Amino acid sequence: MMPAARESLLDAAYTALVRRPWSAVRMVDVAAVAGVSRQTLYNEFGSKEGLARALVRREADGYLAGVDRALAAHADTRDRLAATAEWTVAASRNNALVRAMLTGCWGERLPAPTLSAVPSSSAVPAQRRADGPLPAPTDFVALVRERAVAVLSAPGTPKSDTVELARSCELAVRIALSCVAAPPGEGGVTDLVRTALPRQFGRPLNHL
């Protein structure tokens, strides 16, 4: 199956999940919305559990792609980390799967695939990846921190500065996650992040 066709199946599954609990989502209905046979759906994902894993993997990848965009949107280091925190809060507010992945709170309406890898005999590379380990909340903290450090650290940055940068990046992520659980007041997550980070982070790291 072409990647676009797989995406249409995942879109159909996501739409079904928005409308009803995952336990009430039927494979035959997902296939019908996507315009394929139920057997085609099973050939691609293996099972409803496989479909759930693929959907969670896609939403995880989408969230991390948004992190990359946020980090690239500004020159100022604090602005980049604030934008990343804003994206995290917005993505969690607008996407129940992202919220569940970042907090570990799945709820009865959502699929709850095991985060550890499952046996896979799929011939579909994308499904084999989905059947591998899925990120836990602590994994997302590390993934976002590592992405931020890679973007924000200049070539030749001293190790001590890189360590401090990593701490600040993780702080921004954890502030964002706290705002997912308890929405912030006036000023939002942006003010919280900018206030918490050292003032020197208002300049590019290679100017510190």
What are these regions (language model features)?
Residues 4, 8-15, 19, 33, ...:
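Alpha-helical structural segments
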Residues 78-208:
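An extended, acidic
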Residues 46-50, 72-76, 93, 184:
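Residues in soluble alpha-helical coiled-coils and helical-bundle/repeat scaffolds
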Residues 11, 28-31, 44, 68, ...:
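A general secondary-structure boundary signal
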Residues 23-50, 54:
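Helix-turn-helix
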Residues 20-23, 95:
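Short coil/turn segments at alpha/beta junctions that flank glycine-rich nucleotide-binding fingerprints
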